[in-house]
Structures are given as C-alpha cells and as structure tokens.
Amino acid sequence: MSLPGFGAPAGAATLTGLMQARPLTIGSVIDHAAQHHGRREIVARRHDGRFERADWATVRDRAGRIASSLARLGISQGDRIATLAWNRMPHLELYFGVTSAGHVLHTVNPRLHADHLVYILNDGGARLLCVDPDLLPLVEPIIDRLTSVERIIVLCARSEMPESGLPNLVSFDELIEGAEPMAEWPKVDENAASTLCYTSGTTGDPKGVLYSHRSTVLHCLSACTADSMALSARDCIALVTPLFHVNAWGVPFAAAMCGAKLALPGSALDPASLFALMAGEKATFGLGVPTVWMSFVDHVER
C-alpha cells in the first residue's frame, strides 16, 4: 500500500488509526475500576456519623442502578442532576451514575448564600436535586423560588427520611429500588458535558463551568503520572476537598482509574475527626485546602 509522503497520490485520503479507537468517557473509567480494582475499598462517614464500607465493584453496580432509575424517570442525556451534599457514599455513586449515563452532574456548594443557591440551581436548570438529609433545611426556605427542579432525592434510606414540609421528596433507596444495574452505558460523545460547577460569584453572579468526559479522563491520566499526583492502587486517599468544589480536583475519577482506596469524611471536617479517619484507614495521601491542613497540623502537634 502507498502511504502519504511515500508515493501516495496527491489528494489521497488521510489514514485513520484504529488502535483503541474508543471515546474517552467516565463510564469507561468506572467499568475499568470495577473490572480491575473491584475489591479495592471505599470508606465513608454517613450522615448519622457511622461509617460504611463498599468497593469499586459496588460503586459500579449502584451507579448502574442510578442510571436505570433516571431513565425510568424520563431523564434525558444532557439533563442536569444537581447535588447538595457532603463527601459521602451516595454522592460518590452519583458522580459515576449520572455522568456515565450521559447526564450532567451539577454539584452545588451548600456554604453559599441562599440567593446564590437559587441563582445557581435555576441557571443550571437541574431537573432533580439530590440532597443530604442534614442539608434539607437549606432547601426548605428556597423551594418556591426554584424554577426547574421537579423532584428532590434525599440521600438516605427510606427508614431514615427526616420530617420535612418539602413536596415530592423521595429517598435515595426508593429511587434505585427494583432497578437493574445498567450493564452497558449508553453511547456518549466524549466532548459532551459531564459535570457542571459554578464560581462563588465574588464579582457579579456565579458563572457555570462545564467539564467534558474527555477533559475529565485526560485529567485522570495526568493525576496518575509520576510528576503530578502519582496516584496509584497502593494509595489510600483521604478526600477532604469537597465533592462540590471543582469536582474534588478530579480525584474521585482518578482514584477509580488507578484503583486507589478512598476515605470520605462526610461533614466531619474538624481536625480530630480527620486525624482519626486518616490514622484509622492508614491514609497515604490527603487532599484539602491549606486552612484545613493548618488546623490539622495544630491538632497533631498539641
């Protein structure tokens, strides 16, 4: 055969490489984690303070059930699913279930002023809002101002549902109850939006930033290289950086890619709780903003 530059006629078609010709999608990342690192543990503090344990295979299974449940509700590719939640197990499962099915995960910072919460949720156009039970009081006073939210998913079991005057509340367990895990993810364009984050609005209104599947997978690869974070299957990552803050620096996705263990602190971010978690789980890597580690060091040195 003739190759371009080696006797190929002028105007000959450009050759296309077919090695690993597949899109870079988040679904492929969690599938890889389940297949190659399925038994690698994830530990997370629940809303009631107790810890729960799972592994990457379980996260893939529950992510598949989330995807099937969203399809059952008529959620279409590109629709936004918002979260108002801490670093807990259901939030991690939503990270993969929502995005792998082609929806957009819109993480919202619960520390923002109510007016900013309203603006961000309305501007993002989320159809569903997934809320930790201890954060429901943030939603109750603003629910009448939300223009696109059709249903609120409370991230707990049916038996743990808190009392609330909010309409259309469904527990997380009810959402995925009876749903079969989606065996194969739907076809998703690697350049399609996967997650949506907003700036804090220090100048003017908050501004949305969309991440793509492709950019997320490339960030995963970068985070696992030696001259970046050098994350690997040998690590236990204490993920203090909030899941609602810049996709927790992309680390949940990178941990799935390399098969690292994750330790999620929930809402217990005081130095004593973080030290107990990191020491108990033998964390090798911690991610958090400087103020977190300054108080952490003070606690350790006392």
Question: How does the language model describe each region?
Answer:
Residues 42-88, 92-96, 113-118, 171-174:
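Conserved AMP-binding/adenylate-forming core of the ANL superfamily
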Residues 60-65, 177, 209-232, 240, ...:
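Conserved structural elements of the adenylate-forming
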Residues 86, 131-141, 158-159, 241, ...:
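Adenylate-forming
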Residues 217-236, 246-285, 298-300:
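Conserved AMP-binding/adenylation subdomain of ANL enzymes
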Residues 85-86, 103-121, 133-138, 260-281, ...:
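ATP-dependent adenylate-forming carboxylate-activation enzymes
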Residues 23, 38-40, 169-170, 177-198, ...:
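Conserved pre-ATP/AMP-binding loop-to-beta segment of ANL
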Residues 53-57, 173, 194-221:
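Conserved AMP-binding A3 loop
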Residues 29, 72-73, 100-174, 188:
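Structural core segment of the AMP-binding/adenylate-forming
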